[in-house]
UniProtKB/Swiss-Prot annotation:
Protein name, as recorded: Maturase K
Keywords in alphabetical order: Chloroplast, mRNA processing, Plastid, RNA-binding, tRNA processing
Annotated InterPro entries: Domain_X, Maturase_MatK, Maturase_MatK_N
HAMAP family (UniProt xref): MatK (MF_01390)
Entry's localization field: Plastid, Chloroplast
Gene label: matK
Its biological purpose: Usually encoded in the trnK tRNA gene intron. Probably assists in splicing its own and other chloroplast group II introns.
One GO MF term: RNA binding
Disulfide bridge map: none
Amino acid sequence: MKEYRVYLERARSRQQDFLYPLIFREYIYGLAYSHNFNRSIFVENGGYDNKYSLLNVKRLITRMYQQNHLIISTNDSNKNPFLGYNKNFYSQIISEGFAIVVEIPFFLQLSSSLEEAEIIKSYKNVRSIHSIFPFLEDKFTYLNYVSDIRIPYPIHLEILVQILRYWVKDVPLFHLLRLFLYDFCNWNCFTPTKKSISTFSKSNPRLFLFLYNFYVCEYESIFLFLRNKSSHLRLKSFSVFFERIFFYAKREHLVEVFSKDFSYTLPFFKDPNIHYVRYQGKCILASKNVPFLMNKWKHYFIHLWQCFFDVWSQPRTIDINQLSEHSFQLLGYFSNVRLNRSVVRSQMLENTFLIEIVSKKLDIIVPIIPLIRSLAKAKFCNVLGHPISKPVWADSSDFDIIERFLRICRNLSHYYNGSSKKKSLYRIKYILRLSCIKTLACKHKSTVRAFLKRSGSEELLEEFFTEEEEILSLIFPRDSFTLHRFHRNRIWYLDILFSNDLVNDE
């Protein structure tokens, strides 16, 4: 953050429209190199030097301005106007430069907003992606209906660029961004396919995620505004939104479109118990009352995406279900509300009564089938869940092989300890344990039984099952901690900030 502030003040001292000149500064690409998300994008492929040239970046930007984009041809995508350069390499360089430049002012605005609101400490506490589950345990047991919503992707990247223009008033920067999308990302047709957008998101993940997050933020800001208009209660949220030109005017215009519905319908059906949570492109909307309001919000969501963001969405893609009969998936868990029925015998004088008590409990379960698919994709087992060896790791030492398997097993235990039923988690540990043994046996060119008998590795491999219990025994008092309690209780670790694919966990 201090580095961002220094570079921003240096740019502000030069001229008022500071974003565009930053594209041509050497330290911007040095900053992108130090924040490359664990992947060295500034190392070219074979046949190129292991460093980039800022002079080549400037030359490519100049050539982008010289291209004629008024004539669109089907053969344009096969032409490479940047002969003599590694186009993919410099495409990633300029993409990272764009992402760094547009991130700088928003990092500073976010920091100043949090300081003014005096919520920096609480903001750090809710950064964990698992902080949502204690909220679900407290609130969802009192709710009856849930809607599982997948936020649709925009059909054209131009929509993402236009949304960003409401935040940053720098015309040359956005003009250069469009030229970049045309030249490097094959954005040379009026209706790009999903495949082209998917390719752009994989080759330029930082820039695409930045643009997509602004799209989601814009959608959520309008949703929160409409919700506040339909309820007299104050909305409590951890979201932080920034002021910008034409922001409220655009919101008010949207309210005028739905003024009839809000004026005559919603005031008679107030619902203070509506809850909304989101992670990445998936959100959950839950309510306590009859599903009338849920259908109303479904109607508003679809019209909001179609009329305001030009994103087509079918009504059948948003389902409304009862929580007691439907399970929803969020952050790698399957969650549903289970009804617990118990009978209590009550005696009053000579009469005896049987009272049936129904209580609700939120069940959060480990999805065993998706996890086995991930293990099979990473070559730890087959599609049926039978453990197999990992020959790729056979060149490492025994200690490194065991440590790799333990690291994956430790991360899975850390992430899924909030499950109410840990039987599936123990099955995953069992698969990893046998895969580790088979990998060691493959390295020593022996059978599993002969390897275990010769090396006596049973005690060492027991760490797959005992390490987590030893850690928890240090946290809880020994007199109150039992293995049975560990199996049944849920433990949420609020230090998990993101989740990686199991395949990339090596």
